[in-house]
């Protein structure tokens, strides 16, 4: 028992528990986020007697007489200050880490009203952010300090919300102050808690499940097995091969497979009950890697499949082998890239309950409410379900698949109980699909001038325990492996294998991150062989408007690769003159699904009773700022002012399906659908008032038409548009650490330039981790790392100077010229860093994370 103070109010806490649990579960102070419950991420930071502390570490009994402050307890003036500063700096993306950052900001400024950059970085060092790269958070703290010293807090400008303006994001206030709700922030009356009993072995036959002891425990409501599923057991993003619950007699595929679902009155009872469920297994040999999977007598990961090959892709044009044979210079290398964890700050969570219509209402954090609806409807064998997106605490591709949504929906549908299903951080690290590890063999041929003659490659990937998006990732890796260059002869063969490892699927870059590392590293080596600079060899080979890519596509006027090269040239030359090691790499990345697959953007505008225009789209906002983009599109394409427009969060009963938030597609695809709907609304408004239009709907749809892979055309259109980038890395010649990263990105038209910068900075820091030290080790039992703090993510005090250069290049005739930028920001970073280290010590590195650097993590 303890008596202490929370936000100035005395509280009496009879039950000893973690402070985090008391603040969230009993006081419902949901600005205090639960990101890991292990003292690593900092999302739960509060002040205890004025000092920052992670709320998941102290127990309440140890807090006698102490004073606890959360964001809810800030003064009105402080709330206004931090909301403005974080909004003006562009520091808010997914928002999950932000209340913790705000608390650290207050602690610093209370003690030091004029901190320098190093002092700010040090104050934030215990708090992770996976979205922003910290640059704009640091800028927000600087601005908050300045405004606090001056005693004046401006109002955000609402005058110019047109495309091209760096406005404050729509959701800044609710994310800064913690008032916006993520699924874990929901508390439904009489809510139960559900969780899965997971497989004990990566590959085993389930012989029996005995839940009798768990069911006899007071406070346990139900234990559901595969026999309780009313519809289809298997779900999957494209291929239905992921079991919701492994049946008796069924085979486990990895340690994350769910055997049964336990439902209880509270989390403590739930965890105790799970331990009472007895599962009898026949343990079988596991498949650990693609080489084992490919063996002639290898055990099959799936009973239903006659092979462990999950996908094969072959992309060819011209005569690569012949062109290479005729080349003056030829280089071959083997490359390897690792598993990578998304490490979004918000663990997966879903809340389900019966609404007044008797439907299952599912509150989720995922990358497509309509995809969740489709898969859960098949599982339940019923259309009596609705899905509502809440705030999403980061995704990066890792929230495209089912994780908890289907389990929550099943529990409520079968038992009638409202329920929350949330993954622990260890479960999250195990369950959602990761970035594929790749093994790649590349050969490149060039002429005496460094002009690429041909590239030939073979790649192998480990797609883990189920298909997820393994096939499309492999395809994208292959179609982009040629790089953003103008040559004809190209051939690549790719194979993805099932194993009993955790699944691999979508991750920022979608396979291109892996093959770009290979082809760009080869090109840097080729430049040395030819005797020209890495910058010059790229300029000579760069695709230009009207040019033909190796896949045969003729690129449009919006193509801006050369502009990105020219933008980094002054930095490149300055580093060379100063004798600093500098590395360079380019990249391209499609916007939209492409390759002939259906790719629709849809948007509905409704004039509602408040005489405002409400924007509805099924597209999920996962931190990239889509809602702000659509409002800016609407202001640009209608006569309305910002205050006359309302953005509604994605749902499945009003908002039309606009596909997944993936593939850097939503700004362009749904943005164009919104623009078209705006045209219909504007025509209807002519000669009328908003009051006249109440109840009217205006529907916009855009179909991004492309040609399928292997289309019998000389110049197929594989994608509606591509983004282009050049990044360079400058090392400190004395320490060998990264001193500066420069990233120039062609984005078509920047809808919100400051948000574009934030995407670039965040992508660069994420891929610095990929290049230099992030790890996701998997042991001999197919068990991965369990601790968030051991992933090797970069912290605020470790980031270098990052220069984001946003290049507007007109030419695209959709979505006001905007091209998506979310993925490409992470693609060229690793090869640029690898080349810088070659310039530093003469060692060519072809495996990630890079060995023998100051960042290397020793075992």
Residue ranges of predicted features:
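Flexible, low-hydrophobicity surface segments
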Residues: 145-310, 414
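Phosphate/diphosphate-binding loops
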Residues: 258-259, 264-266, 417-464, 672-691
């Amino acid at each position: 028992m303890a008596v202490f103070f929370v936000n100035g109010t005395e509280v009496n806490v009879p039950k000893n528990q973690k402070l985090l649990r008391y603040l969230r579960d009993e006081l419902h102070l949901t600005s205090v986020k639960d990101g890991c419950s292990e003292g690593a991420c900092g999302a739960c930071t509060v002040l205890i007697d004025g000092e920052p502390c992670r709320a998941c570490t102290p127990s309440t009994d140890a807090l006698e007489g102490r004073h606890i402050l959360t964001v809810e307890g800030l003064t009105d003036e402080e709330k206004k200050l931090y909301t403005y500063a974080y909004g003006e700096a562009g520091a808010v993306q997914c928002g999950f880490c932000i209340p913790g950052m705000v608390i650290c900001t207050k602690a610093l400024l209370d003690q030091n009203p004029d901190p320098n950059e190093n002092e700010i970085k040090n104050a934030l060092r215990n708090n992770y952010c996976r979205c922003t790269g910290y640059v704009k958070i640091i800028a927000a703290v600087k601005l908050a300090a300045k405004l606090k010293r001056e005693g004046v807090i401006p109002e955000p400008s609402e005058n110019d919300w047109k495309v091209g303006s760096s406005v404050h994001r729509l959701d800044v206030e609710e994310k800064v102050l913690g008032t916006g709700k993520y699924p874990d922030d929901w508390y439904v009356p009489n809510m139960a808690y559900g969780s899965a009993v997971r497989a004990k072995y990566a590959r085993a036959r389930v012989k029996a499940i005995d839940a009798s002891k768990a069911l006899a425990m007071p406070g346990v409501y139900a234990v559901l097995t595969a026999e309780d599923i009313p519809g289809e057991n298997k779900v999957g993003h494209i291929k239905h091969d992921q079991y919701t619950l492994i049946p008796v007699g069924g085979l486990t595929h990895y340690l994350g497979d769910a055997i049964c679902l336990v439902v209880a009155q509270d989390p403590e009872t739930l965890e105790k009950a799970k331990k009472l469920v007895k599962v009898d297994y026949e343990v079988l040999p596991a498949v650990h890697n693609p080489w084992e999977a490919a063996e002639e007598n290898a055990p099959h990961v799936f009973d239903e499949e006659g092979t462990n090959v999950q996908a094969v892709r072959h992309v060819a044009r011209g005569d690569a082998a012949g062109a290479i044979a005729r080349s003056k210079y030829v280089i071959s290398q083997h490359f390897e890239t690792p598993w990578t964890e998304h490490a979004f700050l918000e663990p997966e969570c879903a809340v389900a309950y019966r609404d007044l219509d008797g439907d299952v209402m599912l509150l989720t954090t995922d990358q497509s409410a309509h995809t969740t609806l489709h898969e859960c409807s098949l599982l339940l064998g019923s259309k009596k379900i609705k899905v509502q997106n809440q705030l999403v605490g980061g995704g990066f591709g890792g929230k495209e698949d089912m994780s908890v949504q289907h389990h929550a929906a099943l529990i409520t549908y079968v038992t009638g109980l409202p329920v929350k299903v949330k993954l622990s951080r260890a479960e999250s690290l195990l369950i959602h699909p990761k970035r594929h590890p790749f093994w790649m063999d590349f050969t490149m041929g060039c002429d005496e001038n460094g002009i690429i003659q041909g590239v030939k490659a073979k790649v192998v990937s480990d797609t883990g325990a189920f298909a997820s998006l393994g096939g499309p990732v492999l395809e994208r890796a292959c179609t982009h492996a040629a790089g953003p260059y103008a040559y004809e002869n190209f051939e690549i063969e790719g194979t993805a294998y099932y194993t009993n490892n955790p699944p691999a699927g979508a991750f920022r870059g979608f396979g291109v991150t892996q093959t770009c590392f290979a082809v760009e590293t080869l090109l840097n080596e080729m430049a040395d062989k030819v005797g020209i600079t890495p910058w010059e060899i790229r300029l000579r080979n760069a695709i230009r408007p009207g040019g033909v890519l190796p896949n045969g596509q003729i690129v449009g006027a919006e193509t801006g690769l050369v502009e990105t090269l020219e933008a980094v040239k002054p930095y490149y030359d300055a580093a060379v003159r100063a004798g600093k090691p500098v590395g360079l790499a380019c990249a391209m990345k499609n916007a939209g699904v492409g390759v002939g697959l259906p790719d629709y953007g849809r948007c509905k505008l409704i004039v509602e009773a408040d005489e405002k225009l409400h924007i509805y789209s099924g597209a999920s906002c996962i931190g990239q700022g889509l809602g702000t983009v659509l409002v800016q599109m609407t202001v640009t394409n209608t006569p309305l002012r910002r205050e006359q427009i309302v953005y509604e969060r994605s749902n499945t009963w009003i908002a039309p399906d606009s596909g997944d938030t993936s593939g850097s597609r939503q700004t362009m695809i749904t943005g164009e659908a919104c623009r078209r709907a705006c045209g219909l609304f504007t025509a209807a408004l002519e000669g009328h008032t908003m009051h006249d239009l109440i109840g009217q709907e205006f529907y916009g749809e855009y179909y991004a038409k492309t040609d399928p892979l292997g289309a019998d055309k000389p110049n197929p259109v594989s994608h509606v548009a591509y983004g282009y980038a050049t990044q360079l890395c400058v090392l400190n010649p004395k320490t060998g650490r990264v001193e500066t990263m420069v990233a120039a990105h062609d984005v078509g038209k920047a809808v919100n330039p400051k948000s574009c910068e934030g995407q670039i900075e965040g992508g660069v820091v994420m891929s610095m981790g990929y290049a230099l030290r992030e790890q996701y080790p998997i042991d001999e039992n197919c068990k991965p790392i369990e601790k968030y703090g051991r992933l090797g993510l970069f912290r605020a005090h470790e980031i270098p100077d990052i220069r984001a250069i946003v290049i507007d290049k007109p030419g695209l005739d959709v979505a006001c010229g905007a091209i998506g930028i979310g993925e490409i920001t992470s693609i060229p970073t690793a090869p640029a860093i690898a080349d810088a280290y070659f310039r530093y010590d003469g060692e060519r590195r072809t495996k990630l994370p890079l060995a023998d650097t100051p960042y290397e993590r020793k075992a």
